[in-house]
């Protein structure tokens, strides 16, 4: 018995999602918990499901993911990225539509570090001319 289970990694900010995709009924688990329990905000749930909804495959795959780091929003986007990559690995013909929607693009924006001699990354201390 060979189970067709596909693995992919999705990232966003400091969140990393290890996503396992297998044929099923649309059951989504995040860190061994149902996705609806893990993601409290409806927008996070919507973001996470976007790549499956785009291809109308929401009820054809079971998703199991382990997510670490970042906040809930970044974790949801990391899952979306991972699910999209796993779907491409299963069927390369899905790639153009996922790429067009921007789900395969790694969002490289991260928090800019604080610099010494100033209170934040960009903010400067008040300057007095006189």
UniProtKB/Swiss-Prot annotation:
Q: Does the keyword section mention Transport? A: no
Entry keyword annotation includes Ribosomal protein: yes
Q: Which domain of life is it from?
A: Bacteria
GO CC field: cytoplasm; small ribosomal subunit
Cleaved signal peptide residues: none
In the record, biological process GO terms are: translation
Task: Give the UniProt keywords, A-Z.
Answer: Ribonucleoprotein, Ribosomal protein
**Which protein family is named in the record?**
Belongs to the universal ribosomal protein uS9 family.
Q: Tell me what this protein is called.
A: Small ribosomal subunit protein uS9
Organism the protein comes from: Sorangium cellulosum (strain So ce56)
Q: What is the lineage of its organism?
A: Bacteria, Pseudomonadati, Myxococcota, Polyangia, Polyangiales
């Amino acid at each position: 018995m060979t189970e067709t289970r596909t693995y992919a990694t999705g990232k966003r900010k400091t969140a990393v999602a290890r996503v396992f995709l297998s044929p099923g009924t649309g059951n989504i688990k995040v860190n061994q918990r149902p996705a609806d329990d893990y993601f409290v905000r409806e927008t996070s749930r919507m973001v996470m499901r976007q790549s499956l909804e785009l291809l109308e495959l929401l009820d054809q795959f079971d998703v199991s993911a382990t997510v670490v780091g970042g906040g809930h929003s970044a974790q949801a986007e990391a899952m979306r990225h991972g699910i999209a990559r796993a779907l491409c690995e299963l069927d390369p013909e899905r790639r153009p539509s996922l790429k067009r929607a921007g789900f395969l693009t790694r969002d490289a924006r991260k928090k800019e570090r604080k610099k010494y001699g100033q209170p934040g990354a960009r903010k400067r201390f008040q300057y007095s001319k006189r």
